[in-house]
Amino acid sequence: AVEETGRGLFEDKAVKNMFACEHVTNSIINQKTVGVISHDEITGITEIADPVGVICALTPVTNPTSTAIFKSLIALKTRNPIVFGFHPAAQKCSVAAAKIVRDAAIAAGAPENCIQWIEEPSMEASGELMNHPGVALILATGGNAMVRAAYSCGKPALGVGAGNVPAFIARTAKVGRAVNDIVLSKSFDMGLVCASEQAVILDEPIAAE
């Protein structure tokens, strides 16, 4: 990803990929996602989960491989096929990541076409994919314009765009530790993670410190 996009830090990209694989898998492995998943004896309400259908997944240039891994895993867990529209500037690394998950899934018994992608990516192709009548759900991660386009397709969409994350340092905090943690977080993968801190708000009594 670093070589193809020219963005980020190799070591941190590796950490994100491992987090996407291990943490996501461990957090959902015991969740029931199909069939009866809950029943309330008092209200008599039974909650039943069912696959939604084909998922359109758009991924960013900033976190291409980890996003591809994450979205593939949650699609497989919910028994939905997924078709990716990768960012054109991160096509090769994204395909490589998706192939690893796809091949492992097929080896475990998943359908052959459970994970697919647009071979020649473009913003126009991603738009066609989002608006395709066969798509049931959109998972859009990227710039604000693309996320807004996903929300405008007239079908269920979950969008993640650029964040404006504030960090609040309270008067009871260990200021040196807080500053160090914020710097470490903000500098992770050269600051590409959209959830990293963008602003710091200080409690007035410690502002000078």
Task: State where each predicted segment sits.
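N-terminal Rossmann-like NAD(P)+-binding subdomain of aldehyde/semialdehyde dehydrogenases
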Residues: 1-45
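A structured beta-alpha segment of the ubiquitous adenosine-cofactor-binding alpha/beta core
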Residues: 29, 33-47, 115-135
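Conserved small-residue-rich beta-alpha loop and adjacent elements
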Residues: 29-104, 108, 144, 153-157, ...
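ALDH superfamily catalytic-core signature
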Residues: 77, 147-209
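Short acidic loop-to-helix transition motifs that present clustered carboxylates
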Residues: 120-124, 144-146, 164
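Glycine-rich phosphate-binding loop
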Residues: 138-150
